[in-house]
């Protein structure tokens, strides 16, 4: 007998982030003085403003995932070592490209609906950083490869597949935009 079950993808995203942080031994700290999320490599933590300061759940999840992507630069994770990252514009631009593209991959893999306005924001952000290093058109392929490596690492460390299975078997391709859930078959 089949019965329909709905997965709340926002809940799934939060559980995935929690599991990644736990397994990566990474802290997320809500800081009311913080204006935007930031990964602090020295402390190996992500600082985020109050969740209510984000426009919507997608903004919150994608911003936190963006910072989780930066956390993979740590030596005990993927080890992208950037001495003086903030003063090396090209390396900084690469890191931002990696994180923005990888966080978009992660949101898609989780199943979070991305509205056109958000896609436009991602596109503008990627284009801004791409312009910083556009001397070589091959760079975008390098950024895509780096982003794929990051998203795969985070998915494994955050046990995304296991969370999807825990949330109940196979996902149908039909997404209910009103409830922000997938229809499932158990």
Predicted ranges, named:
Residues 91, 104-176:
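Long, well-structured alpha-helical subdomains associated
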Residues 9, 95-99, 139, 143:
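Generic hydrophobic secondary-structure packing signal
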Residues 58, 72-97, 116-126:
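Post-HEXXH active-site segment of zinc metalloproteases
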Residues 1-59, 63, 71-78:
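Active-site scaffold of zinc-dependent metalloenzymes
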Residues 49-52, 81-88, 129-133:
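Glycine- and acidic
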Residues 60-76, 100-118:
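Long amphipathic alpha-helical segments
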Residues 179-186:
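Non-Sec secretion/translocation targeting segments of pathogen effectors
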């Amino acid at each position: 007998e089949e019965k329909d079950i709905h997965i709340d993808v926002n809940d799934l995203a939060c559980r995935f982030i929690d599991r990644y942080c736990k397994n990566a031994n990474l802290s997320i700290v809500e800081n009311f003085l913080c204006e935007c999320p930031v990964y602090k490599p020295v402390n190996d933590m992500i600082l985020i403003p109050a969740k209510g300061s984000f426009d919507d759940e997608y903004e919150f999840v994608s911003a936190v995932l963006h910072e989780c992507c930066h956390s993979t630069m740590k030596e005990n994770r993927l080890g992208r070592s950037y001495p003086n990252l903030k003063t090396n514009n090209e390396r900084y631009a690469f890191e931002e490209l990696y994180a923005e593209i990888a966080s978009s991959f992660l949101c898609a893999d989780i199943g979070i609906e991305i509205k056109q306005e958000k896609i436009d924001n991602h596109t503008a952000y990627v284009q801004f950083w791409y312009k910083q290093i556009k001397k070589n058109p091959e760079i975008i392929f390098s950024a895509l490869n780096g982003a794929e490596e990051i998203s795969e690492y985070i998915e494994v460390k955050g046990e995304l597949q296991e969370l999807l299975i825990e949330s109940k078997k196979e996902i149908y391709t039909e997404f209910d935009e009103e409830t922000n859930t997938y229809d499932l078959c158990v």
